[in-house]
């Protein structure tokens, strides 16, 4: 089984209204960007698993190997609205397709730049989510694939099982579980490949306190541990392949960060 560990810091451009609680209003809306560093060295000397109350997580000495940003976008600027509507119309959705898109998403969350999916690579992977009714739900996956002549083709996949990523508000020791599933069939673009992802999501607010990063210090954060027990499945020229893996994310949320 393959294990992946991710270190994230998520903040908001809105001020928090209560201490040690994070609401849907604190979460990013529309186009928003925060600085992010990819660390390639020195991780083995750091302990990301410390939990509890009034903690101090000091990662000030982490390297800044690759600088970038983690961001969200509006659905209209995601690059996946037109492919979704086109795919919906071809499936017989007609004039209801834009309405359906708007009902499924009001924010696009950039996942990763690229994803190695066995026999091919997915690019610009994005979760089109709906933030409403105190929930953040992943409903559509957007991604791109490079065809045989080097052209980037956008593809969208509506979740067969929508994924409740977060429930709001959350505070110390809150937790939740959900299940998500989505997949794509690439035969329509000349690739004899079917790719499917299924996973169980479990998250818990396992600490609060102060987070120190190479960028700055955050004095009032909630630490969330998210575990995805995931299976990636590919059918390639009628040959099924499967890879189970466990993905662990540690995320610190600061409601008072602009």
Predicted features by range, described:
Residues 110-146, 169-174, 208, 217, ...:
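Short, solvent-exposed coil/turn segments at beta-strand boundaries
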Residues 143-240:
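Short helix-loop boundary/capping segments
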């Amino acid at each position: 089984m393959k294990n992946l560990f991710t270190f994230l810091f998520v903040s908001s451009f809105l001020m928090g209204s209560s201490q040690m609680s994070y609401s849907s209003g604190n979460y990013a809306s529309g186009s928003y960007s925060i600085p992010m560093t990819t660390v390639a060295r020195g991780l083995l000397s750091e302990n990301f698993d410390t939990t509890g109350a009034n903690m101090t997580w000091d990662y000030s000495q982490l390297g800044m190997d690759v600088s970038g940003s983690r961001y969200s976008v509006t659905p209209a600027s995601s690059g996946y609205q037109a492919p979704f509507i086109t795919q919906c119309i071809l499936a017989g959705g007609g004039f209801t397709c834009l309405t359906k898109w708007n009902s499924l998403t009001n924010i696009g969350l950039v996942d990763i730049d690229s994803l190695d999916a066995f026999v091919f690579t997915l690019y610009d992977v994005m979760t089109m989510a709906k933030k409403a009714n105190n929930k953040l739900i992943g409903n559509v996956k957007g991604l791109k694939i490079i065809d045989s002549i080097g052209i980037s083709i956008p593809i969208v996949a509506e979740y067969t099982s929508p994924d409740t990523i977060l429930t709001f508000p959350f505070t110390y020791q809150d937790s939740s579980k959900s299940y998500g599933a989505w997949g794509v069939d690439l035969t329509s673009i000349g690739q004899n490949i079917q790719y499917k992802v299924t996973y169980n999501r479990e998250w818990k607010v396992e600490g609060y306190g102060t987070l120190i990063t190479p960028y700055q210090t955050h004095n009032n954060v909630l630490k969330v541990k998210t575990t995805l027990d995931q299976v990636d499945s590919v059918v390639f020229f009628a040959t099924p392949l499967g890879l189970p893996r466990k993905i662990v994310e540690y995320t610190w949320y600061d409601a008072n960060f602009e």
